[in-house]
């Protein structure tokens, strides 16, 4: 292998990729440049999907929109470009991921210094022979040519003048711009200087580009000199590594080749013995694995839009080329591990995000392998017939039915020397849009009515959610604001019917899936719909959501993608519900039957027929039994059979439920077998953990158990743990002491409350002594009606009795008050009548009850002493006044 021979040849020049990177940054750091870490591949610039150049992080500085980080800067910037993706692996130097070494001047040094340093770095640090170097300048940049020729000393015959298309940089139609100068390496200097053609990439490779930003271009194309001139340079790390390591292409440098070796090892092949076709596949794998590893590290996840689509496309190309070289099993985790190990020294964040990177690689690979296997089988049948080309209809069927990307069909066709009828593909897509419009209904009803009528007029939705969680679909119907519509725009809440869907529609107690619909949309700029519920109406699935971006119209093709995390939680909860019913039958009563259920993303609820409460001990047994089944890792068996076969096998059905002739049976062997149309885990171990939260009664003879499973258990326990931590902090005890401490506090509180009640009673008696003077004479009787707040019922009774004792047997005492003056929601009224009043037929119990009604309450008691309560403190004064009037009339 060429790399191993070239990395060390006895001299001190940088050779490895790491050495080249370090040498470049050190060279400019020693010349007062601030070393700037690589920015993310996800740029801050909203007009650009990915970081495509080393200067992109500094673009706001060059455009005058941000302050410069320093007068001089240098960086090694990771970049991604996919405009030439079809050339990756087929040419010596095309890549998707690459590192751009750069030095920058923000209004500091300019052209001559930049050229001199570039030459010094190239010839003295990297040790390249000037005889192997050629430079280019813009055709009108006499200054640059003069510097190269007279200051640096480059042979004039090896200075090439180039047109604007090659050697003039501009940020856009207007704004900062300027000429460029490039340094090329000549692999064949013996051919001489008379016939130099820089387009000959077999002889020349451009490795260092110097941009001199010295002009501003106005709307009419006029160039005026900039007051502050800037320098932007870029050296391709991979290209310099190829030159210094003496290998035939960038892929066989130490920067990429270890990944090729890893992939070749997984395939059981010797890369150096392969033909060009085989080598191309391994080059694609090596290049793309660097790209997707860094994309995931920088927060990009696979999707069908924007940078997420770029990552998905790259990842799928890796899997596809892996299969071409015989790697049939999932291998992206191994490639991800190798990529991290290769690049972690320069990018430590790869290690920090290792788990995230590997998890995303595994998920997306598994998802695509399903699609790939189905599509390749169909495509193989097409190719057996030796067609002249793959028809548009065939390509569309692969795309529409099997989710096979068009570009992948094109790539496979090209490998067989065929083309794809793209015009026919577009026609097939348009025909589907027309069919969708013809199938759409036109109604003007309320939302529910609209959905019901729509469901009645449409064919049943093809549900694919047992097999796939993502697939292309066509929009058949739209409802906006309760009316059918042909299109919906950003901000609209919509109900959408698709011809087929991976989304589970709410039924059998399980909630509908969440997720996203995405596609090109009618505006061509992309549409995104968040789906937050799915319901079923006559086997038509209605997706409830909101248009987040773009415009959606009838006939549009969208990619339906279920939120996998939500689906996994629902699956765990649904299978846990089956285990719960089995445990209840085993622990409590074998005759227990289901009365209802709820399977949500973060909780589950199971209602069952039972005449008594489930004891705490039984709940512990149920919980232990279920967690035991989870840890035993039972594989679930899901199959369809006739209802008679299912019942004969012992499958549990819900009483009163109507079932079709053919039913779906979910079997946890030896544990549970139920008729069920919901989604479930493949193995009980996927549930993780099960925890009962509550047991209660919902109706006569019906009990309810609420529980959590999977990740929700951790959230529940964390919440409980947080409560305990706060208690420990407040009580200043250890966990083992908390029960004893709380019991002690309860006793202290009980004692304090008893003492407080006694104190209030004494206070009431003390206060009441002064009230005796307020009694008024009504004939031969004494009447006292007064308000006394801040006293509980017992204290108020003591006060009334004490006043009656002072006033004698011919007295009537009525007291009212608020036990808590700040709470007008609780009123207490007390009446104490002497023997003479009772002899006249007056009774304290009846009297105080009638008065309490004025405060929104009631009560009563003995003829001589009674207490009542009320809920309206604002009416208390009026009630006491009424008591005074009523007694005056009764006693007068």
From Swiss-Prot:
Signal peptide: none annotated. Pfam families: DHHA1 (PF02272), tRNA-synt_2c (PF01411), tRNA_SAD (PF07973). GO terms for biological process: alanyl-tRNA aminoacylation. GO terms for cellular component: cytosol. Keywords: Aminoacyl-tRNA synthetase, ATP-binding, Cytoplasm, Ligase, Metal-binding, Nucleotide-binding, Protein biosynthesis, RNA-binding, tRNA-binding, Zinc. It catalyses: tRNA(Ala) + L-alanine + ATP = L-alanyl-tRNA(Ala) + AMP + diphosphate. Its cofactor is Zn(2+). CDD domains: AlaRS_core. It comes from the Bacteria. Its main location: cytoplasm. Zn(2+) binds at residues 574, 578, 676, 680. The keyword Transport does not apply. It is found in: Cytoplasm. Catalyzes the attachment of alanine to tRNA(Ala) in a two-step reaction: alanine is first activated by ATP to form Ala-AMP and then transferred to the acceptor end of tRNA(Ala). Also edits incorrectly charged Ser-tRNA(Ala) and Gly-tRNA(Ala) via its editing domain. Consists of three domains; the N-terminal catalytic domain, the editing domain and the C-terminal C-Ala domain. The editing domain removes incorrectly charged amino acids, while the C-Ala domain, along with tRNA(Ala), serves as a bridge to cooperatively bring together the editing and aminoacylation centers thus stimulating deacylation of misacylated tRNAs. NCBIfam families: alaS. Belongs to the class-II aminoacyl-tRNA synthetase family. This is Alanine--tRNA ligase. It comes from Prochlorococcus marinus (strain MIT 9313).
